[in-house]
Swiss-Prot record:
This is Eukaryotic translation initiation factor 3 subunit L. GO terms for molecular function: translation initiation factor activity. It comes from the Eukaryota. Its main location: cytoplasm. Pfam families: Paf67. The keyword Transmembrane helix does not apply. Component of the eukaryotic translation initiation factor 3 (eIF-3) complex. The eIF-3 complex interacts with pix. Transmembrane segments: none annotated. Belongs to the eIF-3 subunit L family. It is found in: Cytoplasm. Residues 306-514 form the PCI domain. It comes from Drosophila willistoni (Fruit fly). HAMAP family: eIF3l. One of its GO terms (cellular component) is eukaryotic translation initiation factor 3 complex.
Length: 539
C-alpha cells in the first residue's frame, strides 16, 4: 500500500498519519510518542518537578533545582539540549507555569552548554519566554501564588541580564551574519532584548515589590510588612525586587553609567551585611560591580574597602565554591577579577589592607605586576583592566545599513580609553611619592634634580604642577555612613602629606602601622575553635 521509503527516517511516518481527529486520543498518542523517546529518569524528574512546583514544596523544588537538574544535565544532556517544550508538555498536562519555568532552564542550558551557543531563533524565543514569565507575575491583578527558592530567583534575574548582555554582543558582530539575519535583527525583531525592555522589567519588579520602601523602613527599625503591600508581603515578589536592584546595578555598569549604578542601590547599605544577602553569588556579584563602579569614579578608598571585604568573605567560605557548577565557576572567576582590580587600586591609591588579603596577593605573584605598574608600565595596567572589567555593551545596536564590521569591542575600547587616560595622569606619582617618603623637608630644586638631573627652572615650575596633581589625585570622596553609596566626604588617602612654603616642601608621614593584633587574635580564636572540635572527636 505504501512505498518502503515512506517508512524510513526512524518511523517518522507514524507521526504524520496516526492522528484520529479526536483531541483526547491525539493527546494520548502524543504523550506516548514523546515519552517513549525520553529516558525514564528524565520523564519522572519532570513529572515530580512539575508536581512540586504546583504544590509549592520549597524543599523538593530546591533539591531538584540545585542537585537533580544539574546531575541529569551532566548525564544525559552535557552537550545537547533538554527535550523541547512540546515533548515536555505531553507529560505534564500542559501546565502553563511549569512550562514557562522549564523553558527558562531549557534556554539557560543552551546558553551554557551547547557548543557554538544558541541560534538566533533560540535567543528570540528565550526573550519571549521571559516576557511570558514577567507578564504573568507583574500584570496580574492579585499576587501569583508561586513559591520558588531564593537561589532560583537570583539566578533567573542574573540570567535575564546575562542573556541581554550576550545578545547585545551577538547583534554587534555583523561580520558573521547573512543579510537575512541582519534583516531579522534590525527590522523584524528590533525590540527583542532591547535596553528599554530590560530596564522596564527590572524597574517594574522593584516597584511592584515595594522593596525600596521596605529597605528604608528596615533601616529605621520598622516592620517592613507595614509598607510592603499585597505583592511585597510575599517572599517571591520581595526577593525578585531585591535581586532586580542588583540586576539594575549590573546593567548600568555594563553601559558605563557608574553614577546610576551606585544610585540605584541607595536603599541598600552597601557596606553593611543585610538579611537579604544570604545568596553568596548575589553578594559577590554586588560587590564586584559596586567596587568596579567606585574605581571608575576614582573613589579608590571605597573600591578597596568593597573588594577587601568581599574577598575576605570568599576566603572564609571558599569550601562552598569548590564543587563544579556554573554559579561557582562564576564566583571563582569574579574573585580572581576582584584581586586584579584591587591590585590596580592599591597602585593608584596605596593604603593598608587586611594581612590575609596581602598574603594572597603575595602568593599569586600580584606584587611583581604591581611593581611594574608603580614603575609606569601601562601595558600591565591595560592587561589587568581587560581581564577584570565587565564585558561592556552598547545600548544601541548597529544600524541595518552599517558597514559589515565587528562592533563588539567598541564599548570596551571606550571604557579602556577612559581608564588609561586616568592612569596616564597618575603614572609619575609613585616616583614622586617614593622621593617624598625619604625626607621631612626637601627643596623644590632638589626634588626636581632627583626626577631629572638636567632640570631647569621651567622644570621646577612643572614640578609644582606635578605636586598639585599628587594632592588632587590622593584626595578622594570616601563613604562614611548613610544608605547612599554616593555620599561621603573628601579625605586624603595618601600615606604622607605635605605643604610648600616658599621653595621648601615640608613632609609629614601619616602612614598607619599594621594592626597585627587583630590578625593574631583571629588566628588564636580559629585555633581555639579547631582545638574544641578535635577534643569532641571520638577515636
Amino acid at each position: 500500500m505504501y512505498g518502503g521509503d515512506e517508512f524510513s527516517n526512524n518511523g517518522d511516518f507514524y507521526d504524520d498519519y496516526a492522528h484520529t481527529g479526536d483531541p483526547q486520543l491525539d493527546l494520548e498518542y502524543e504523550r506516548s510518542y514523546y515519552t517513549s523517546r525520553m529516558p525514564d529518569n528524565v520523564k519522572y524528574f519532570l513529572m515530580n518537578f512539575c508536581q512540586a512546583i504546583k504544590d509549592g514544596n520549597l524543599y523538593d523544588i530546591q533539591n531538584m533545582y540545585e542537585n537533580t537538574f544539574p546531575q541529569i544535565s551532566d548525564h544525559h544532556f552535557d552537550k545537547t539540549a533538554w527535550p523541547e517544550e512540546q515533548e515536555v508538555a505531553s507529560i505534564v498536562d500542559n501546565e502553563k507555569v511549569f512550562l514557562i519555568l522549564y523553558k527558562e532552564l531549557y534556554f539557560r542550558h543552551i546558553h551554557a552548554r551547547i557548543p557554538g551557543g544558541p541560534k538566533l531563533d533560540q535567543r528570540i524565543n528565550s526573550f519571549f519566554n521571559y516576557c511570558d514569565f514577567f507578564n504573568l507575575i507583574i500584570s496580574a491583578q492579585n499576587p501569583v501564588m508561586l513559591e520558588l527558592p531564593d537561589i532560583w530567583l537570583w539566578e533567573l534575574v542574573d540570567e535575564f541580564v546575562y542573556q541581554f548582555q550576550n545578545f547585545a554582543q551577538y547583534r554587534a558582530r555583523l561580520t558573521d551574519k547573512s543579510q537575512d539575519e541582519i534583516q531579522q535583527l534590525c527590522v523584524n525583531h528590533s525590540n527583542v532584548w532591547s535596553i528599554l525592555c530590560i530596564l522596564n522589567v527590572l524597574h517594574s519588579l522593584v516597584d511592584i515589590s515595594n522593596i525600596k520602601k521596605q529597605l528604608e523602613v528596615i533601616s529605621q527599625g520598622v516592620d517592613p510588612q507595614t509598607v510592603a503591600g499585597d505583592f511585597g508581603k510575599l517572599s517571591f515578589y520581595k526577593m525578585l525586587g531585591y535581586f532586580s536592584l542588583v540586576g539594575l546595578l549590573r546593567v548600568h555598569s555594563l553601559l558605563g553609567d557608574y553614577y546610576q549604578a551606585i544610585k540605584v542601590l541607595e536603599p541598600i547599605e552597601i557596606h553593611k551585611k543585610s538579611a537579604y544577602s544570604h545568596i553568596p553569588a548575589c553578594q559577590i556579584s554586588t560587590s564586584y560591580y559596586v567596587g568596579f563602579a567606585y574605581m571608575m569614579m576614582r573613589r579608590y578608598a571605597d573600591a578597596i574597602r568593597t573588594f577587601s571585604d568581599i574577598l575576605l568573605y570568599v576566603q572564609r567560605t571558599k569550601q562552598l565554591y569548590s564543587t563544579r557548577s556554573y554559579q561557582n565557576d562564576q564566583i571563582n572567576k569574579q574573585a580572581e577579577q576582584m584581586y586584579h582590580l584591587l591590585a590596580i587600586c592599591l597602585v593608584l591609591h596605596p593604603q593598608c589592607i587586611d594581612e590575609s588579603i596581602q598574603q594572597v596577593l603575595r602568593e599569586k605573584n600580584y606584587h611583581d605586576a604591581m611593581f611594574k605598574m608603580q614603575c609606569g608600565d601601562l601595558d600591565v595596567f591595560k592587561s589587568f583592566f581587560i581581564f577584570a572589567c565587565p564585558r561592556f555593551v552598547s545600548p544601541c545596536p548597529p544600524a541595518a545599513d552599517a558597514p559589515m564590521e565587528d562592533y563588539v569591542k567598541d564599548p570596551m575600547e571606550h571604557q579602556l580609553l577612559v581608564f588609561m587616560d586616568e592612569v596616564r595622569q597618575q603614572k609619575d606619582l609613585p616616583t614622586t611619592r617614593s622621593y617624598l617618603k625619604l625626607y621631612t623637608t626637601l627643596p623644590l630644586a632638589k626634588l626636581a634634580s632627583f626626577i631629572d638631573p638636567n632640570a631647569s627652572e621651567d622644570d621646577v615650575s612643572k614640578l609644582l604642577i606635578r605636586l598639585l596633581c599628587f594632592k588632587h589625585k590622593m584626595r578622594n570622596l570616601v563613604w562614611s555612613k548613610g544608605p547612599s553609596g554616593l555620599e561621603g566626604s573628601f579625605k586624603s588617602g595618601s600615606e604622607l602629606d605635605f605643604y610648600i612654603d616658599d621653595d621648601m616642601i615640608h613632609i609629614a608621614d601619616t602612614k598607619v602601622s599594621h594592626r597585627y593584633g587583630d590578625f593574631f587574635v583571629r588566628k588564636i580564636l580559629k585555633f581555639n575553635d579547631l582545638n574544641r572540635k578535635l577534643k569532641g572527636v571520638n577515636i
